[in-house]
Amino acid sequence: MDKFTVHSGLVAPLDRENVDTDAIIPKQFLKSIKRTGFGPNLFDEWRYKDVGEPGMDNSKRPLNPDFVLNQPRYQGASILLARRNFGCGSSREHAPWALSQYGFRAVIAPSFADIFFNNCYKNGLLPVVLSEQQIDHLFNETNAFNGYKLTIDLDKQVVLTPSGQGYEFDIAPFRKYCMLNGFDDIGLTLRHADKIKSYEAERVAKMPWLNNRVVG
């Protein structure tokens, strides 16, 4: 996955509490065995006026002009500003996939559902927890100013506003290490590839019968 060090991006405000994973990526789009192609159906039931199904040409579907991601001022947003309990509901990993594939690098909220929170880290999407008061201030700023951008410095663990105000956030050291270096579970395992190969070779030498193929 991509490294996350410092990111500056346009903010899109999603002013709803308890946004669940079925709203983030509806269940009918979970049939694919691939991990790609979910971005166009992010918040599908809110972005479009019709009912979406896999295989539809989204470019021909009627958009909901009132939904935040369809408004011109938020096109190209890479930081999602949300309310409490974001990502509640089922544990589908497709939810952070859809957010990342749409173009979001981070979600800032006062609280997240636990499983969604963990899935974000495993897929390179940074979940940032700030206080309710700080979130309220950011919503006010984002709504008041076109082109409102934030900078997230993961190494320093701070969110910087255009005025230079900084909001510090917490992150577990191991998760921070993985995000800074772009390590998902597979990447962490591959760091030990030489040791794994050495162990496998040693095992074959000591217990060759384990490699015998049983037929019948």
Swiss-Prot record:
Keyword Lyase (UniProt) = yes
Q: What is its EC number?
A: 4.2.1.33
Give the UniProt record's GO annotations in the biological process aspect.
L-leucine biosynthetic process
Show the GO cellular component annotation of the record: 3-isopropylmalate dehydratase complex
Question: Which branch of life, at top level?
Answer: Bacteria
- Sorted UniProt keywords: Amino-acid biosynthesis, Branched-chain amino acid biosynthesis, Leucine biosynthesis, Lyase
> Pfam family of this protein, just one?
Aconitase_C
Which SUPFAM superfamilies does the entry mention? LeuD/IlvD-like
| Keyword Lyase found | yes
- MF-aspect GO terms: 3-isopropylmalate dehydratase activity
Q: Which reaction does it catalyse?
A: (2R,3S)-3-isopropylmalate = (2S)-2-isopropylmalate
Q: Which CDD domains match?
A: IPMI_Swivel
Q: In which pathway does it act?
A: Amino-acid biosynthesis; L-leucine biosynthesis; L-leucine from 3-methyl-2-oxobutanoate: step 2/4
**Family per similarity comment:** Belongs to the LeuD family. LeuD type 1 subfamily.
Outline what the protein does.
Catalyzes the isomerization between 2-isopropylmalate and 3-isopropylmalate, via the formation of 2-isopropylmaleate.
| Subunit structure, interactors included | Heterodimer of LeuC and LeuD.
Show the PANTHER family listed in the entry: 3-ISOPROPYLMALATE DEHYDRATASE SMALL SUBUNIT, 3-ISOPROPYLMALATE DEHYDRATASE SMALL SUBUNIT 2-RELATED-RELATED
Quote the protein name from its UniProt record. 3-isopropylmalate dehydratase small subunit
Q: What is the lineage of its organism?
A: Bacteria, Pseudomonadati, Pseudomonadota, Betaproteobacteria, Burkholderiales
